[in-house]
């Protein structure tokens, strides 16, 4: 079963949602991920009313370009997070017809993380949203095993784990770890490539994740093998930031072609 391809907003983070949608459609993507809540201090910040107005304006653009929104990001969970504060983001995601909402956990307390995530999932359920917990070596939830444990403790049916190829590699997770994950516990995969050797230090790992990813096939990651152990036909979101001075459309087209070559390898082998 083919993997639908989505263009992650980080790939063209300087492009507003309107441009991202047009470019994703021209490049051949099936889906798009939209960053409507900041993940970093430099990201665009929308107030709640502005975000809803934007989403209403995006609906005809999505329809006209034959695209759907797969994922809206991002919710960052810290020890003092009020889950109810994220209801407006859930409303916006639902308005767009998004199916997923991405969550990153900054809490180092697994019990607190599970409590917050459980409440967040309860709030998201009436909107028809599944929450994907993305683990990162430099976040509070650092590995696939840790993410699965937090979700298991949260005990909500609309929780999944997002496997980002870069974070999977940097966490030292294996194919066997993914195979051993309980059925239905994994959501989708984010594709990028990179060096096998990790950069040294916390700041360097963050910098790599935000600015120094490579297109699928342009590095040393075992992406075809990764896709083989992920759920059949799961969405593959391509997350590779545009380098300074690059052309957004050319970049998106390159990412689509590169990702499709990797996914086609998996399909032809099955």
Where is each model-derived feature located?
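Histidine-acidic metal/acid-base catalytic patches
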Residues: 1-6, 14-30, 87, 91-97, ...
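N-terminal small/glycine-rich loop or linker at the start of catalytic domains
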Residues: 1-6, 65-73
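Active-site beta-loop-alpha junctions enriched in small/polar residues
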Residues: 8-12, 35-39, 74-77, 104-108, ...
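Hydrophobic residues within beta-strands of alpha/beta enzymes
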Residues: 32-33, 70-72, 101-103, 131, ...
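Glycine-rich, proline-tolerant flexible connector loops at the mouths of alpha/beta enzymes
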Residues: 33-57
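Surface-exposed, active-site-proximal loop segments in enzymatic domains
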Residues: 40-49, 75-90, 204-210
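Residue-level preference for long, well-ordered alpha-helices that form the structural scaffold
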Residues: 47, 51-54, 82, 109, ...
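Active-site acidic/histidine proton-transfer and metal-coordination neighborhood
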Residues: 61-68, 76-161, 170, 250, ...
């Amino acid at each position: 079963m083919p993997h639908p391809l989505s263009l992650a907003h980080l790939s063209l983070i300087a492009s507003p949602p309107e441009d991202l949608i047009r470019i994703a459609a021209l490049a051949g993507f099936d889906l798009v991920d939209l960053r409507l809540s900041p993940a970093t201090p430099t990201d665009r910040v929308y107030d709640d009313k502005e975000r809803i107005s934007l989403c209403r304006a995006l609906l005809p653009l999505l329809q006209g370009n034959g695209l759907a929104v797969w994922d809206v990001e991002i919710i960052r969970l810290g020890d003092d997070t009020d889950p109810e504060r994220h209801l407006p983001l859930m409303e916006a995601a639902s308005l767009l017809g998004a199916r997923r909402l991405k969550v990153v956990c900054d809490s180092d307390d697994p019990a607190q993380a599970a409590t917050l995530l459980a409440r967040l999932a309860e709030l998201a359920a009436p909107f028809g949203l599944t929450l994907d917990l993305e683990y990162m070596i430099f976040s509070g939830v650092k590995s696939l095993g840790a993410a699965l444990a937090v979700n298991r403790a949260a005990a909500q049916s609309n929780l999944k784990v997002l496997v980002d190829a870069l974070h999977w590699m940097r966490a030292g997770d294996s194919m066997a770890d993914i195979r051993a994950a309980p059925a239905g516990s994994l959501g989708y995969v984010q594709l990028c490539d990179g060096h096998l050797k990790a950069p040294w230090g916390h700041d360097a790992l963050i910098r790599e994740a935000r600015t120094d990813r490579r297109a699928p096939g342009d590095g040393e990651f075992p992406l075809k093998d990764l896709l083989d152990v992920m759920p059949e036909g799961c969405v593959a979101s391509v997350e590779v930031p545009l380098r300074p001075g690059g052309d957004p459309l050319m970049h998106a087209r390159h990412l689509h072609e590169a990702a499709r070559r990797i996914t086609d390898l998996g399909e032809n082998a099955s």
